[in-house]
């Protein structure tokens, strides 16, 4: 079985595993206060182009989102998000469980715009009964989005300016950030993201680590007592050096960016080969998530050899599905022009669809 259903089906990059074994019997301080976390923080600060940012290591994406958002908001405040945002659809109501509402906006491509954010916020405060409604205080975006689209530099800058003008915090979920940064259409750098958000995180779980995310905080208001929130929300690891070692290894020798570029390249190859076969796509994604629309009969055949995620039924006989490449994907697994793959994709039942 070849798994394309997510980008965390393998363990971790070999260099990380080797470093974990090498340091296994060392004694270090706990809870992220060890030398490896310190070294990793310095490498991340350098990559972000800002020595003033705080860097914290948390165990996973949901814990990170809940910790960041709950640390920033008062109990009567909520967070603006695309309706397809991860915090709204894929975190089991974790944010609502700690008392904060997702204020959802419909989007055609998973991306919020500066105009939408301004309109939503202005409409809230224009209502005479605004104090009877949840107050928008933070904007949540993810890059890439849940459907693989990315924010361009001009879009992010415009969103951040709207947020600053209206007193909103801007938070970027970067669970797949490496894959967004290294795709061909991207024009953002880590420095750009640092300068145009209040807080964001660099995903490790989906980009070569066993587990873990690195939160980068630029806004001084959000730095105070953040570690209290990490502990309270279940994101703090006693053996914190396991996180530090992983991010130290990822940010050495350009490794994080190189392995992300590998995934982006193979996703582009997969997309190109399917396009040549006449396959249409649910969305034009430049990143490691691709969403082909295929006949259900073809999908039934593909399931015998491959796993992938269901996205949406398009009509009575076709469905959109998600294929993810990752840092560990093998070249031959995305070679849809090979004899092994064309037997399923170029069958008569496909060609007449």
Roles of regions detected by a PLM:
Residues 75-76, 268-339:
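Conserved C-terminal alpha-helix-loop-beta "cap" of PLP-dependent enzymes
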Residues 14-61, 83-88, 94:
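Conserved N-terminal alpha-helix of the aminotransferase class I/II PLP-enzyme fold
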Residues 340-353:
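Single conserved hydrophobic/aromatic residue that forms the stacking wall/gate
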Residues 99-137, 141-144, 151-158:
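PLP-dependent aminotransferase-class I/II
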Residues 108, 135-136, 142, 150, ...:
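Active-site C-terminal subdomain of aminotransferase-like
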Residues 71-89, 118:
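Conserved PLP-anchoring active-site segment centered on the Schiff-base-forming lysine
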Residues 151-183:
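Catalytic PLP-binding core of fold-type I/II PLP enzymes
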């Amino acid at each position: 079985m070849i798994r394309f259903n997510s980008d965390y089906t393998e363990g971790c990059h070999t260099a990380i595993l080797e470093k974990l074994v090498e340091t296994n019997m060392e004694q270090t301080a706990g809870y992220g206060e060890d030398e490896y976390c310190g070294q990793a923080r310095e490498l991340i600060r350098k990559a972000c182009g800002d020595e003033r940012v705080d860097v914290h290591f948390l165990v996973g994406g949901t814990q990170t989102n809940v910790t960041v958002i709950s640390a920033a908001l008062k109990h009567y405040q909520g967070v603006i998000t695309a309706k397809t945002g991860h915090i709204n659809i894929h975190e089991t109501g974790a944010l609502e469980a700690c008392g904060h509402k997702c204020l959802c906006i419909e989007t055609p491509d998973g991306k919020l715009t500066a105009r939408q954010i301004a309109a939503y916020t202005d409409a809230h405060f224009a209502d005479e009964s605004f104090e009877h409604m949840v107050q928008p205080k933070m904007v949540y975006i993810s890059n890439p989005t849940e459907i693989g689209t990315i924010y361009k530099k001009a879009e992010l800058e415009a969103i951040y300016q709207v947020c600053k003008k209206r007193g909103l915090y801007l938070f970027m979920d970067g669970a797949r950030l490496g894959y967004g940064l290294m795709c061909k259409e991207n024009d953002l750098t880590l420095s750009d993201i640092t300068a145009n958000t209040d807080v964001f995180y660099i995903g490790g779980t989906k980009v070569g680590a066993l587990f873990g995310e690195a939160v980068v905080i630029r806004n001084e208001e959000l730095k105070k007592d953040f570690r209290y929130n990490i502990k309270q929300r279940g994101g703090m690891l006693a053996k914190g050096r396991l996180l530090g070692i992983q991010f130290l290894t990822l940010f050495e020798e350009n490794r994080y960016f190189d392995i992300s570029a590998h995934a982006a390249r193979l996703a582009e190859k997969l997309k190109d080969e399917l396009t040549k076969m006449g396959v249409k796509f649910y969305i034009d994604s430049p990143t490691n998530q691709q969403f082909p629309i295929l006949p259900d009969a073809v999908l039934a055949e593909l399931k015998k050899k491959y796993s992938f995620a269901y996205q949406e039924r398009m009509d009575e006989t076709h469905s959109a599905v998600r294929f993810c490449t990752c840092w560990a994907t093998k070249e031959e697994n995305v070679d849809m022009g090979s004899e092994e793959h064309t037997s399923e994709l170029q069958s008569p039942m496909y060609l007449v669809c």
